[in-house]
Amino acid sequence: MQYKNWVVIITGGGTGVGAAAALMLAKGGAKITINYSRSATEAETTAKACQELGGETLVCQGDVSNDDDCRRIVAETIEKWGRVDGLMNNAGTTQFVADNSLEALSADDFLRIYHVNVVGAYQMARAVAPSMQEQGKGSIVNTSSIAGVMGVGSSIAYAASKGAMNTMTISLARLLAPEIRVNAIAPGFITGRWWLDKLGQEGYDKMVSGVEKSVPLNHAGTPEDMAEAAVFLLTASRNITGEILISDAGMHLGGAPLIAR
């Protein structure tokens, strides 16, 4: 699939699924705004790799929980390339809670996670919608999680935020049609630094092995697996909107450990 001259904003685009999607789009000649909040080095590295693959890039720092930052990210993209064809809301945060006690999460924890995972995605959609509506077309893909479907994951606050993102995706799909399609991917376990940083190498290796043994497809999902789903919804699925596409090697079918991205 070619994405020649497609202009796409990817929040949280310097690492993980966002970086994998940026590289995939770059191979087809896309123009990509790579947003990051704190991972400046990783964002610059991803941008350089995209350029080597034939893509054009703009690296843009910004916190999606800040509405001014969201509007600036979109404005800088339009200033550079004149339009926005796609938005991938991939920026996200969580809080790992090992304790089963309800006291392990505070109201502030919930609000912090919601401000990034839900409000941030909404603010980016709101910022980009006028440009897409004016040109008569556009596509938004939200990176959700199987946590929002199954009520599992790193914490109740995280799972609840992804459930809210799923509902918001459907609401935005209704509101922004027919010009703009809005969909989401719901990854299961994803290999990479999120779990590695939390568990250490030994614990991470055990988790990957456990996932591979327990899910129906015997496969631990990679950032590239999720990027394929996201790029499909973003660019090729003109008849699909309001869809939550689960990509979890069958974890949601049951018999899987209670883990998620």
Predicted regions located by residue number:
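C-terminal substrate-recognition "lid" of short-chain dehydrogenase/reductases
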Residues: 2, 122, 219-247, 252
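Alpha-helical segment proximal to the catalytic Tyr-Lys
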Residues: 130, 173-178
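Substrate-binding pocket helix/loop in short-chain dehydrogenase/reductase
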Residues: 70, 98-102, 106-111, 140, ...
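Active-site helix of classical SDR
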Residues: 125, 161, 169
